[in-house]
Structure formats: C-alpha cells, structure tokens
Swiss-Prot record:
Disulfide bonds: none
GO biological process: succinyl-CoA metabolic process; tricarboxylic acid cycle
Manner of cofactor binding, per the entry note: Binds 1 Mg(2+) ion per subunit.
Amino acids binding substrate: 264, 320-322
Species for this entry: Anaplasma marginale (strain St. Maries)
EC code(s) of this entry: 6.2.1.5
Positions of ATP binding: 46, 53-55, 99, 102, 107
The protein's name in its UniProt record: Succinate--CoA ligase [ADP-forming] subunit beta
PANTHER family in the record: SUCCINATE--COA LIGASE [GDP-FORMING] SUBUNIT BETA, MITOCHONDRIAL (PTHR11815:SF10), SUCCINYL-COA SYNTHETASE BETA CHAIN (PTHR11815)
Subunit and partners: Heterotetramer of two alpha and two beta subunits.
Keywords for this protein: ATP-binding, Ligase, Magnesium, Metal-binding, Nucleotide-binding, Tricarboxylic acid cycle
Superkingdom in the source lineage: Bacteria
C-alpha cells in the first residue's frame, strides 16, 4: 500500500525524523485559514499523488506570497499529472501539501528497502539527492553506497559508518546520516514497510538533517497488525476495480489493454500476460483469484473484469488444490448470471481438467476450451482482433 508524501512524513515524524512543518489543503478556500500555521517566507506547493516525478511534471512549485500560493493551489487542485510513474491518463490531484521553505545546505538520498535478492534489509545512501537514484547508480555508481542489514541483529552504527565511508563526510555529517539510517530502518521493520525513501534528505545550513520528500510503501500482508497504517489508504488513488477486488480477497491491478485475465497464482498470471503480448494482444489487468478460489470468487472476478470494458477474456486455471470441474461450473454459472458478451477462452489444467473441459464444451454458451496456454492465448488474441 502506498501513501501520500504528507502521510509518509507523519509516520517518519512519529519515529523521530525531523520534517518541515506543512498543511494539507483540498480547496483554495482552505489556504487562507491554514497558511497561518506555517512560518512566513517561501512555501513549497506540492501535488499529492501516488507517483514520483512530480517536480518535472509541474507538481512541485514554490510560492513567495499568499496570493502566489493560492494561485498555485488553484492550478494544481483537480488537475491531472502525468509522470513517468503514472499511466498515460495520469492521476488526478485531490490534495495539495503546503510546506515551509527550508534553508538547504546539501541534499542527500537515503532509503531502506526489503531486498529479497540477499534476504536482508538494504540501506542505500548517496551524496547526490533530489535526483533519480537509478540514474545515479547507473551513471555514477561510485556515488551510491549500500549496506545489507541482517534482521537478526538489526541496524548497528558500523552499518552507518560503512555507508558514509567513501564520501568524505565530517563527523557531524556522519552522525546525522547514521541517525537517519537507524530511524528509517526502525520505521521499515516496525510498520511492515517494504520501502522507506527520503529523497532528498536535506542538511540545513545549521547542520540539521531532515526529510524534504518521503515515500513509504507498506506490505499489504502486514496491514492487519498495523490498523493505524491501514487507515492511511486513499481510495481516490486506486481504480474502482482494485478496491472492489480487495473486498473479495482478489489481487487485481488495472492495465491499459483490452484482454481481461483471470488466473490462479501470481506467477501464472504474469506468464499469462506475457504470452498474450507475445501473440500481439494487450492484457487489461492482472487478476489472481488465489489457490482456493470458489464459484463466488470466479463470479466476482468476472464482474470486476467486465467493468473495464474488455474485448475478450482469458481464464487460465491450474487445478492443484482447486478442482477444475468446480471452476468450470463457476465459469458457466457466472457467464449465465452476468451475461458475458465478449469472447471467452478457458484453459484448464490439473485436477479433473477433462471433466471441466467437457462441462464447458457442453454448456452451449460459446465458451472456447483450449488445450494449453499457447493455444488459449492465440485464440483470444485472434478473436479480439476479428471483432474490431
């Protein structure tokens, strides 16, 4: 689960990270009332969306006067930002964060991330902040330092010392970086986050270290034990289909194609999307019904897929624990109830798959039962293209 910058800073602040004072506005009228809570001077006006690259897209501006701040808020609110991390349609701005200006002496980058490749928490630090860290790592790898923290022992001061070693920082700067690294590690572990990023981390002219921008991604599987974190979810930042899927325990991600996918298992779902593209089609979604899907889950999955206006649907089920005949019955009943009026191709493999295929063939609903995934993908792409 992603959160807005102002929410991420609220979490960081609760763990002792210094952040500039700021207020959130959802209308221009709120500016007059809330701007007084900030110190006089420059104000950073920041569009709040769940995507990076806001600055280059015009989503971060500096206001010098109240009138200028109000004008910037008016421009941003309800506008659509398109960045390298959004879809081509962009994301609508429903909130704007107003933040006190900071006297910046130096900018850095620091993050903590669950690194599955090493089975550790990786702390990443760079003396170049406020820029895309992937670009820095690619073009100037000597400017990025990484340490791996064993969760059995946790973060230690020597980890922080190692982060700073190559950058020639003074004792006070090293102390500031080590302190920040320790805090973000604690945030990551105690909130079940998968990533905590501060970019840039600013060193002020007085030597104080603070978070100028922040991003936190939380593991959805840990939200049950972090109810206060779960409350931070902003429904406006998610597609309606994604929210509906979550209610029914389905994993759904909306995409830009026109072929709906219903699959059991994340790996199989990704392989299904890949093979659709291989045959020249475009998947409309990632939808994992899970290993224990029943007829109700299949019915809800069909409803969600059809909300997107797809031109065809590919169902790819491997029956391990699940029985393919039960899934076939669910597909048939759902098709009758909902009225699926687009081409539907089903590939069943595993437990009772022969029975399942026969049920589909005998249903009289025009459902195409494919023998394997290659055949299924080629069938659905061809059918969709023929209907254009």
């Amino acid at each position: 689960m992603n959160v807005h910058e102002f929410q991420a800073k609220g979490v960081l602040s609760s763990f002792g990270v210094t952040v500039p004072r700021g207020v959130v506005v959802e209308s221009v009228e709120e500016v007059d009332r809330l701007l007084g809570d900030l110190a006089p001077g420059l104000v950073a006006v920041k569009a709040q969306i769940h995507a990076g690259g806001r600055g280059k897209a015009g989503g971060v501006k500096i206001g010098k006067t109240k009138d200028e701040v109000k004008s910037l808020v008016k421009q941003m609110l309800h506008s659509v930002l398109i960045t390298h991390q959004t879809s081509p349609e962009g994301q609508k701005v429903n909130k704007v964060y107003l933040e006190e200006g900071v006297d910046i002496g130096k900018e850095y980058y620091i993050s903590a991330v669950v690194d599955r490749s090493v089975g550790r928490v990786s702390i990443i630090f760079s003396s170049e902040g406020g820029v895309d860290i992937e670009t820095v790592a690619k073009e100037r790898p000597n400017m990025v330092s990484v340490v791996h923290v064993d969760p059995l022992y946790g973060f230690r001061s020597f980890h922080g010392q190692e982060l700073c070693r190559r950058f020639g920082l003074g004792p006070k700067q090293v102390s500031g970086v080590v302190s920040m690294a320790r805090k973000i590690y604690k945030v990551l572990v105690e909130t079940d986050a998968s990533q905590v990023e501060i970019n840039p981390m600013a060193e002020t002219s007085s030597g104080e270290f603070l978070a100028l921008d922040a991003k936190i991604a939380f593991d959805d599987n840990g939200l049950y034990r972090n109810p206060e974190i779960a409350k931070l979810q902003d429904p406006d930042e998610y597609a309606a289909e994604e929210l509906e899927a979550a209610k029914h325990g389905l994993s759904y991600i909306k995409m830009d194609g026109n072929i709906g996918c219903m699959v059991n298992g994340a790996g199989l779902a990704m392989a299904t999307m890949d093979i659709i593209k291989y045959y020249g089609g475009e998947p409309a979604n990632f939808l994992d019904v899970g290993g224990g899907a029943n007829q109700e889950a299949v019915r809800e999955a069909f409803k969600i897929i059809l909300q997107s206006g797809v031109k065809g649907i590919l169902v790819n089920i491997f029956g391990g624990i699940m029985r393919c005949d039960v899934i076939a019955k669910g597909i048939i009943e759902s098709t009758k109830e909902i009225g699926v009026d687009v081409p539907l191709v089903v590939r069943l493999s595993g437990t009772n798959f022969e029975i399942g295929r026969k049920l589909l063939d005998d249903s009289g609903l025009g459902i195409t039962a494919a023998a394997d995934l290659d055949e299924a993908a080629s069938f659905i792409v061809k059918m969709v293209n023929e209907r254009r």
